[in-house]
């Protein structure tokens, strides 16, 4: 079986030839099917640039990114757009819900774009809503929902298309601690029960402790990685803090 994600010798430069900034420096790592991986690093470490390259929002300067064996750095135009729609699910810090659509319509939109039949759309939206405990908000508009509810709607939108990979960028960044915990429990459910493969960028150690593996980036390079294994979430949290201390920077920002 192909790995869900393979990043090989990735490099990304910004700026002109006279003043180049290297955001990613010869970075390589893999993500296995049904794995939940967190990416951590200080501000400016390259983690957001990495996610942008994987999501095809940005093109790498060099290197390759494979999703289930397909080199997405070679895709262009409509083929790239179709791949992004069908193979990726996105969860953003600021939800990215359309204010003029209900929760149901926001979730269904991802399937409508793929020309899925109405009966199938309804079935899949209802299932995703049940999985993420948001059936009671399906007829509500974003302004009528709490931040936690909006992020669970966004998560349902991400999972409803059954993507190969869910990409989450600071998904708890706009949530309070209770809403964050509820969302992360749903991430675990998506990963363990729905077999979703998740790659999550976060600065928050508590959020990262829900992952099965944490990859640490420093100055655009792979600094270290740790696996949860049989460790409890509390023990894994402690291991994450230990690595962040070695990584440098203000550990309090990650608490």
Question: Over which residues does each language-model region extend?
Answer:
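Conserved ABC transporter NBD signature motif
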Residues: 63-71
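Conserved ABC ATPase signature
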Residues: 141-145, 149-151
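A short, proline-enriched helix->beta-strand linker immediately N-terminal to the Walker B motif
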Residues: 160-164
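Catalytic Walker B motif of ABC-type/P-loop ATPase nucleotide-binding domains
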Residues: 166-169
